[in-house]
Curated annotation (Swiss-Prot):
Residues 4-182 form the Guanylate kinase-like domain. It catalyses: GMP + ATP = GDP + ADP; dZMP + ATP = dZDP + ADP. Its EC number is 2.7.4.8. GO terms for cellular component: cytosol. The gene is gmk. Keywords: ATP-binding, Cytoplasm, Kinase, Nucleotide-binding, Transferase. This is Guanylate kinase. PROSITE patterns: GUANYLATE_KINASE_1, GUANYLATE_KINASE_2. Pfam families: Guanylate_kin. SMART domains: GuKc. Belongs to the guanylate kinase family. Disulfide bonds: none annotated. CDD domains: GMPK.
Amino acid sequence: MSIGRVVVLTGPSGVGKGTLLKAILSQHPEAFLSISATTRSPRPGEVDGQHYYFLSREEFQTKIAEQEFLEWAEFAGNLYGTPRSPVIEQVNLGRTVILEIELEGARQVRKTLPSARQVMLLPPSVEELERRIRERATEDEAAIARRLLQAQTEIGAAKEFDRCVINDQLDTAITALEAAIFS
């Protein structure tokens, strides 16, 4: 049995990571999407253990101390991390493991797993990104401003990634992301 591959997928909030990943995973059930842990509150419809592992800050910090995360970072006032053991288990089973994580987490993974493929998902424009974030209607103006500021940093880091995919037309973006992950 061959060893699997880790693929890191990063992109600004609102760029469409969830939509594209849903399409990719429906076409590639052999791939494994790592479920991240977070201290943020669940959004409507999100289920613990399916979308994220929702933890208190104290629980999260205990897991950091016990080195249970492959990577972790603070983003928009919340902690996010990738539980280590499921990733290692799935890679050892020969599966492609996708980590949907923030920029700082991607940088940590580059240090700990230099063979991981790093893919940045980009918006067609900052204006379109802002429209998508506002369309969610889940955040106040201050949170939107923070996300847009962070997006500038993330877009500026695109050169650090092995592949970049622009999410403009959905079908084209799905095809490009599929190639970035599996080829």
